[in-house]
From Swiss-Prot:
Protein keywords: ATP-binding, Cytoplasm, Kinase, Nucleotide-binding, Transferase
Role description: Essential for recycling GMP and indirectly, cGMP.
Domain Guanylate kinase-like: 5-183
Main location: cytoplasm
UniProt name for this protein: Guanylate kinase
Annotated localization: Cytoplasm
Family: Belongs to the guanylate kinase family.
Residue sites binding ATP per the record: 12-19
Xref: InterPro entries: GK/Ca_channel_bsu (IPR008145), Guanylate_kin-like_dom (IPR008144), Guanylate_kinase (IPR017665), Guanylate_kinase_CS (IPR020590), P-loop_NTPase (IPR027417)
Lineage: Bacteria, Pseudomonadati, Campylobacterota, Epsilonproteobacteria, Campylobacterales
One Pfam match: Guanylate_kin
UniProt organism field: Helicobacter pylori (strain J99 / ATCC 700824)
Catalytic activity, as annotated: GMP + ATP = GDP + ADP
Any GO molecular function: guanylate kinase activity
Coiled-coil residues: none
Length: 206
């Protein structure tokens, strides 16, 4: 199978539920690899370096850019975010499903690298619900939340570039949907080697 058919990109506004759904997929599908993003922002309360993100200084991040260590990178809310190349390529060679939790900018760049990747946009029903979730999370200032809401509106204008949309109103239902999508990845027809399959069906007596 072609490796890039095992890529699942999750995008959407902060607070829509991407992290929760990613964690669920990792619990339900043993052979997965979560692509840990590298960022220059400070850890939120409860976040662990190397578990939730790779936290680095701006200088370290820029050095990584110069060395070509990132598949994609972008500046979001005045912080650098990027996807490291080596762990992703290693996981693909091992036949794992690689899951990305990245923004819309990152999605566009990754699709250029991996055109067969499957992408899912995850959102709340409307802006008011997203604002409520961000306020309840209690990790951002009011100013930061306003910036996130403005950015979320901009991201919603890019929906047509994604393969699937999940309006995350009912978490259990959203879990079922994302699991179904992930399980179908390796069974898409374009992922198969047709020549190999046809050879297996060859009948010398015909």
């Amino acid at each position: 199978m072609n490796n890039d058919f095992n890529l699942l990109i999750l995008s959407g506004p902060s607070g829509a539920g991407k992290s929760t759904l990613t964690k669920y997929l990792q619990e339900k599908i043993p052979k997965t690899h979560f692509s840990l993003s590298t960022t220059t922002r400070k850890p939120r309360e409860g976040e662990v370096d190397g578990l939730h993100y790779n936290f680095v200084s701006e200088e370290e991040f820029k050095q990584g850019i110069e060395k070509g260590q990132f598949l994609e990178w972008a500046i979001v809310h005045n912080h650098y975010y990027g996807t490291s190349k080596i762990p992703v390529e290693k996981a693909l060679k091992e036949g794992k499903i690689v899951i990305f939790d990245i923004d819309v900018q990152g999605h566009e760049i990754l699709k250029k690298h991996y055109p067969n990747a499957c992408s899912v946009f995850i959102s709340t029903k409307n802006q008011e619900i997203l604002k409520e979730r961000l306020l309840l999370r209690g990790t951002d200032s009011k100013e930061t939340i306003e910036k996130r809401l403005i950015n979320a509106y901009k991201e919603m204008q890019c929906l047509e570039s994604f393969d699937y949309l999940i309006i995350n109103e009912d978490l259990e239902k959203s879990k079922e949907i994302i699991l179904s999508i992930a399980k179908t990845l390796v069974h898409r027809l374009k992922a198969f080697n047709f020549e190999k399959i046809c050879k297996a069906w060859k009948n010398e007596s015909l």
